Every structure is written in C-alpha cells, then in structure tokens.
C-alpha cells in the first residue's frame, strides 16, 4: 500500500508545493531579459514586427525605462539590444534610437508609480476590426470588460 494513502490532504498539498518549488524554480532574469522574452512572446502571439507597437519597462533610476530599438521587430529583440532611456528618450545605455512614440510612456510612468511595464501593440486582426467601424458583439466572458464600452 502507498505511504501517501494515510497522509492528510494538507500534508499532501504541502509536499506537492515543496516539490514544485524545488523542481520548477523560475530563474532570476534582468529587466532587459524579461523585456526581450516578452517581445518574443508577443511576436509568437501574432503581434507583428516593425512599427507595430512599443514595449517598455521601468528602469531602476527614477525617470528611466528600457525599450526596444526603433526598426527592430518583436522577433529581433534580445537583451543585448534593449535600450535604457530617460524621459527625453536620450539613450543612457545601449546603441540605437528608441521609437519616438515611446514619449507617452514617460507620462504614464510619471503619473502612475505603480506601473512597471507598458505594452502598446497594433495586432493585425484588431487593426482590421477597428477599420470596420462596427461595434463588437460581446458574446464571450473574456470580452465582458468591454460591455457597453465598444
């Protein structure tokens, strides 16, 4: 007979959580690494490259944030080509030009100290839907936040 048959549910849960903690440890990543991974995830999700949007993450120093270089697609971003910029989009670390459209990210970070990352994209299918000028039919639970707002 199994040893676990005599254990309580709370002990089994505790053991399972302990095993998961040991086996599924999430590696620590730098902000540029997280930003690059997020860009890749967005690209894999159909968010195209080029001028299809911007992503930024708050820097450690007040008034700074990390962003991708202008001209590189989400699929081309690596932790080594991410830029650290100030509120005037002056590059403090890295080489390249940030997207001038990132300027509004500075305003958001200044007004909302609780915000640590901004993702602004133009997915192809959403752009196509917006050109139809037809209100969305809220017919799925995932769209409920849009009820009477689209």
Which residues does each PLM region occupy?
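Glycine-rich flexible loops
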Residues: 2-150
């Amino acid at each position: 007979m199994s040893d676990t048959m005599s254990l309580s549910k709370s002990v089994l849960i505790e053991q399972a959580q302990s095993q998961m903690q040991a086996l599924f440890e999430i590696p620590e990543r730098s902000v540029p690494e997280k930003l690059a991974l997020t860009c890749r995830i967005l690209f894999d999700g159909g968010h195209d490259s080029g001028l299809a949007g911007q992503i930024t993450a708050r820097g450690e120093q007040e008034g700074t944030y990390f962003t991708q270089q202008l001209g590189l697609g989400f699929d081309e971003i690596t932790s080594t080509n991410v830029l650290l910029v100030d509120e005037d989009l002056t590059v403090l670390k890295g080489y390249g030009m940030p997207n001038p459209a990132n300027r509004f990210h500075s305003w958001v970070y200044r007004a909302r100290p609780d915000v640590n990352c901004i993702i602004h994209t133009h997915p192809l299918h959403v752009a196509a839907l917006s050109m139809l000028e037809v209100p969305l039919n809220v017919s799925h639970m995932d769209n409920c936040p849009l009820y009477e707002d689209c």
